[in-house]
């Protein structure tokens, strides 16, 4: 996840270049982007997650939290079982949160 974010940062910084290599140097806040014949050191704190539910070191929910995002995740907690997460369209049926996952599972009774 962090490397994906760094690739996005890298592409934003070097939009017309083919690629860059990302190196990890032990501390999550000390990543370096290595570009051919050019080295960019990211500022301290550049990798801190702006999301209140996400632990920037593990890329998982912070201690005591259930989820980071998803249709059945609100304020870092799973939404109650039975809450509609996808409304029915046409002959379709509603999909409901299970209370145990951030995803919106398909209704098992659908054709």
UniProtKB/Swiss-Prot annotation:
UniProt keyword Signal present: yes
List the GO molecular function terms.
toxin activity
Instruction: Report the leader peptide range.
Output: 1-20
**Cystines in this chain:** 53-76, 67-73, 72-97, 85-104
Write out the propeptide range(s).
21-47
Pfam short name (any one): Disintegrin
For this UniProt record, the keywords arranged alphabetically read as follows: Cell adhesion impairing toxin, Disulfide bond, Hemostasis impairing toxin, Platelet aggregation inhibiting toxin, Secreted, Signal, Toxin
> Any idea where this protein resides?
Secreted
Q: What is its main location?
A: secreted
- Reported function: Inhibits ADP-induced platelet aggregation in human platelet-rich plasma (IC(50) is 8 uM).
Query: Subunit structure, per the record?
Result: Heterodimer; disulfide-linked.
Q: Which family does it belong to?
A: Belongs to the disintegrin family. Dimeric disintegrin subfamily.
Please state what the protein is called.
Disintegrin DS-AS
Originating organism: Atheris squamigera
């Amino acid at each position: 996840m962090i490397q994906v974010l760094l690739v996005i940062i890298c592409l934003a910084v070097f939009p017309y270049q083919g690629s860059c290599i990302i190196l990890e140097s032990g501390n999550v806040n000390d990543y370096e982007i290595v570009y051919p014949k050019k080295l960019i050191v990211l500022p301290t704190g550049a990798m801190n997650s702006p999301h209140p539910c996400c632990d920037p070191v593990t890329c998982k929910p912070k201690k005591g939290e259930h989820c980071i995002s998803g249709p059945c995740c609100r304020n870092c907690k799973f939404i109650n079982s039975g809450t509609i997460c996808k409304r029915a369209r046409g002959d379709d049926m509603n999909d409901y949160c299970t209370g145990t996952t951030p995803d919106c599972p398909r209704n098992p009774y659908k054709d």
